[in-house]
Amino acid sequence: MIDRDKHQQLRIGLASPEQICAWSKRILPNGRIVGQVTKPYTLHYKTNEPEKDGSFCERIFGPIKSGVCACGNSRVIGNEKENSKFCEQCGVEFVDSRIRRYRMGYIELACPVVHVWYSKRLPSYIANLLAKPLKESEGPVYCDLFIARPIANKPTSLRSRGPFKYEIQSWRDIIPHYFSARGFGAFRHREIATGGDAIREQLAGLNLQILMDRSYMEWKRLGKQKSAGNGWGDRKIQRRKDFSVRRMKLAKHFLQTDIEPEWMVLCPLPVLPPELRPIVQLGGGELITSDPNELYRRVIYRNNTLTDLLARSRSTPGGLVICQKKLVQEAVDALLDNGIRGQPMRDSHDRPYKSFSDVIEGKEGRSRENLLGKRVDYSGRSVIVVGPSLPLHQCGLPREIAIELFQAFVIRGLIRRHFAPNLRAAKSIIRDKEPIVWEVLQGVMQGHPVSLNRAPTLHRLGIQAFQPILVEGRAIRLHPLVCGGFNADSDGDQMAVHVPLSLEAQAEARLLMFSHTNLLSPAIGDPISVPTQDMLLGLYILTVGNNQGIYGNRYHPYYSKYKIFSCKKPSFYSYDDALGAHWQKRIELDSPLWFRWGVGLRIITSVDREAPIEVQYESLGIFHEIYEHYRIGKNEVGEILSIYIRTTVGRIRFDREIEEAIQGFSRASEHPNKSLPAIII
């Protein structure tokens, strides 16, 4: 088993035949070697006990009951006084039955079998290494083509002929070139190969360093060629360059990982532990078996048949042996990836068997369903909605979710503050949802961040930390600017919330994962928290006016009914006065008004030196210069007394939000150790 304290990472790759045998072979104290599965049986039909040397054998995989052998004898596990650790009659070790979850077996194949993942899937690694088309590399795998053995790499006329099919006419054309048909059997065994033997010998004869150097030289030569002037020639050169790059990468990977190419051809076939492919007995005595058991059974049946044919090879026709090799290859293909070559193997109910590929890949496979998508404690899930009033670093957590996530902390708080004497009383208070519960919960959440995650997590910003606050409803609320990092929108997307428990996790969340510290894309450095279409539309509606300029809509029919608005617009001296009038519905969001501006503040217009439209004089010498978007009041000596700008309530509100945001960032930069204040962006 893998010790998580000793191993920090897990790498999946090819295993050598020696490694596969080392996983399974064991030497018993009496000197017998066990581990090889030779019989296609699983359980005895009368006793439901595992068959000896079958795919559920207790001698190979361990006892079904801890410390009990197949004979029924028992030993105390871990008792040093017991001399024998295995049964001398049946050969079963007295160990824990959990060993059947990870102890493996193996099947010694009568002929090498090519792993279908590396021959049939695109790109085909075997075809790339051998520099052959996919059909030509698959022909020898299923005994459809024969090739000459690479004996001392001599350029014989047979090798120069290329692959040929197993046909009577083909043999008749080849035999007269060499000798009579009397010694053709020995000649075929020595000079001609097919099946996994042929592919394995070709892969074993490769020099990866020379292959990589030649591919690099070819890529370099093709790169120097000028364009042919037609699309077909250029595409052909580009395909050849891509092929050279794939060969270089593949050869480099084999060299760096110390993996031999011939390991893509299986000689011993590993057998999964029986607990990973169980047989379940129903109430009526009926047995239900896993699909890999049936696929293993077919492999063992066909492999044993091939072994018998090879044992009496003198009396067995060569075509029968070749046909049986093809059946073994197809059985192993169905075990690894059923249906990859067309029609899958089916059971009696016409249902395709689930192979290893079906169990591993896909959304419901082992990786995504059981390893990556496992539910964990202190986590929840809900739909997300927009919370525009939230600061950038906060998220709204529903009360129902928050009380479940922080229940342990709330119980501790209730007991510490003497609101509950014990655990049962604290849970009763939480169940009744008394007001003190929400007070304690808010205190707990104030200093505890949470992590939000939206699947699929394609980059670092798929998980970010937030300061939670309690909200009503059942949906998680998020600031709209952080949705870009999650690639989320508010049309029904769901997000998971996790509570970091350890101090290290909380420190990481505060220092590295808070949303206000992840404003730039880690890939290209561009801003990722930018306004989207809905926010831009809202800003446009907030800042647009219903008319432009001082003369805009002067003769609109609406103002002809209300003369006071046609001649004089309301004036306000502060933000609060203007916003208060809007909340009292005296003016609309886009209604034009005069707003008092600071005398020392600059007025930015589209024209540098704008001439006044008109000048209005009063009796005391005070006059007003009226411009397109503002007016200036001056005394008789020309000193500025007042400035009013023409704006709307929406623009005043937008300006105030920007001002508060800038002040908030200024305070945060002056006190970097304090938490970020509530900023509305």
Curated annotation (Swiss-Prot):
Keyword Metal-binding among UniProt keywords: yes
Protein residues bound to Zn(2+): 69, 71, 87, 90
Record Pfam families: RNA_pol_Rpb1_1 (PF04997), RNA_pol_Rpb1_2 (PF00623)
Record GO biological process: DNA-templated transcription
Gene3D superfamilies to which the protein is assigned, alphabetical: 1.10.40.90, 2.40.40.20, RNA polymerase II, clamp domain, RNA polymerase Rpb1, domain 3
Residue numbers binding Mg(2+): 489, 491, 493
A single Gene Ontology CC term: chloroplast
Cofactor descriptive note: Binds 1 Mg(2+) ion per subunit. Binds 1 Zn(2+) ion per subunit.
Entry cofactors: Mg(2+); Zn(2+)
EC number: 2.7.7.6
Organism domain of life: Eukaryota
Catalytic activity entry: RNA(n) + a ribonucleoside 5'-triphosphate = RNA(n+1) + diphosphate
GO MF: DNA binding; DNA-directed RNA polymerase activity; magnesium ion binding; zinc ion binding
Alphabetical keyword list: Chloroplast, DNA-directed RNA polymerase, Magnesium, Metal-binding, Nucleotidyltransferase, Plastid, Transcription, Transferase, Zinc
Major localization class: plastid
Oligomer status and interactors: In plastids the minimal PEP RNA polymerase catalytic core is composed of four subunits: alpha, beta, beta', and beta''. When a (nuclear-encoded) sigma factor is associated with the core the holoenzyme is formed, which can initiate transcription.
Record-linked PANTHER family: DNA-DIRECTED RNA POLYMERASE, DNA-DIRECTED RNA POLYMERASE SUBUNIT BETA
Known function: DNA-dependent RNA polymerase catalyzes the transcription of DNA into RNA using the four ribonucleoside triphosphates as substrates.
Sequence similarity: Belongs to the RNA polymerase beta' chain family. RpoC1 subfamily.
Name listed for the protein in its UniProt record: DNA-directed RNA polymerase subunit beta'
